[in-house]
Each structure stands twice: as structure tokens, then as C-alpha cells.
A protein has these predicted regions:
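N-terminal glutamine amidotransferase
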Residues: 1-131, 136
């Protein structure tokens, strides 16, 4: 007689999640277009805003950050033409911290130009020591 075993991982995780999503591409001439497709696939994770930062060796960093859905913002070929290069990272946002009214400064990825080069960063989750880090770094 066989006995049925319960599944090792129950199937109770079938709902959409309200979390951010990150997607990156490296080594493709139009990396930002691939990132836009990846963000579209992750759209259910973040529905408030999205952003893409790309880097081109000859043009440096370029970014686009917008409120709303990926399909409404990153399908415009004129906008995507402003995001050249073989490196790109994107983020879709679902806020769990910060103010209730969305502000563009909270839309990721973040990037900065420094004396030794630039950097772009996107993260998921809350930075629990954000206030202390802000005081220390700024």
C-alpha cells in the first residue's frame, strides 16, 4: 500500500507579489531594450514606477525614470534611442517605504558620476539604516 506524501514545498504561493523587481543586461549593443522587455515580464512586481540606467563607453551614463507601467513608458522608440550601450540595469517599483506620494527621486536605478568613474545601483527591499547612511554619506 502506498502512502501519499505532502509536497515538500506547498503550492500556497500562487498570488502576485507586491515587490520591486530588478533586471540587468551586459554585452548586447542595445541592452536597454532587453532590460525593458525584462522589466515588462516583472511588471506584476512593481506597478508604481520604473527606470533604466545604461552606460555606453563613448557617451557615459543615460537614464530614464518614469511613473506608471513599463508598457506605457519604455515602448517609445524615441525614448529608448536615448539609452544606448552594452550595459543596462532596470528597476520596477512597489514602495514599501518613503512618502505616500510618489516622487521621482525615489524611482530607481540610482546613478552617480564620480572622479574615478560612475556607478548605477538598484536594490530590492528596505534599507533599514537609511537615515544613518544618509547622514554618513551626504
Amino acid at each position: 500500500m502506498s502512502r501519499q506524501m505532502p509536497p515538500a514545498h506547498p503550492f500556497d504561493d500562487d498570488k502576485l507579489k507586491e515587490e520591486c523587481g530588478i533586471y540587468g543586461v551586459i554585452g548586447v549593443a542595445d541592452a536597454a531594450n532587453f532590460v525593458a522587455l525584462g522589466l515588462h515580464a516583472l511588471q506584476h512586481r512593481g506597478q508604481e514606477a520604473g527606470g533604466i540606467v545604461c552606460h555606453h563607453p563613448d557617451h557615459g551614463f543615460n537614464n530614464a525614470r518614469r511613473f506608471g507601467y513599463v508598457r506605457d513608458n519604455f515602448t517609445d522608440q524615441n525614448l529608448m534611442a536615448t539609452l544606448p550601450g552594452p550595459l543596462a540595469i532596470g528597476h520596477v517599483r512597489y514602495s514599501t517605504a518613503g512618502g505616500k506620494a510618489p516622487v521621482i527621486r525615489d524611482v530607481q536605478p540610482f546613478f552617480g558620476e564620480f572622479s574615478m568613474g560612475g556607478a548605477a545601483v538598484a536594490h530590492n527591499g528596505n534599507i533599514t539604516n537609511a537615515d544613518a547612511l544618509r547622514r554618513e554619506l551626504i
